[in-house]
Amino acid sequence: AQCDEYFSSALTSMEKEEDKKQLPSDWPPIVAGKQALYSGLAQYHQSKLCSEKNAVAEEMARLEYAKTLLTAGIERGTGGLRNVKEWLQRTEQALIKARKDNDFIYHERIPEKQSLAAIEKSPVAKPTPLTARLGNPDAPGLFELLVTP
């Protein structure tokens, strides 16, 4: 969920006029695709937690939302991410299984995606402004601190 938020803020930053000039024109669609893909993967993994808790209705809602997001991500461009179609197939198979379980056993009403609880976020990185690196020719290289002199 945090990765989705980072890509969303990166996309918002890329749409600013001062940043648009410094970036290749194909970057925003790729970032938009990745944002949708990571959001879809977060929903897929959250659906697995719902499955473990026997919350079939929420599981189905999250899987349907994940399918929508993964499909949108594929349409926008995967940006070099592999196995995206495989994740979409896994999502579709899990959705079929959850629907069968719900139809035969639980008979629960599927909640709307807007009513789903937000997925907890875990910060894993610190965002850097685009212009801090791209706009300053004197800025240290991206990997300069990782390489010993």
Predicted feature residues:
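Amphipathic alpha-helical interface segments within eukaryotic helical scaffold
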Residues: 1-8
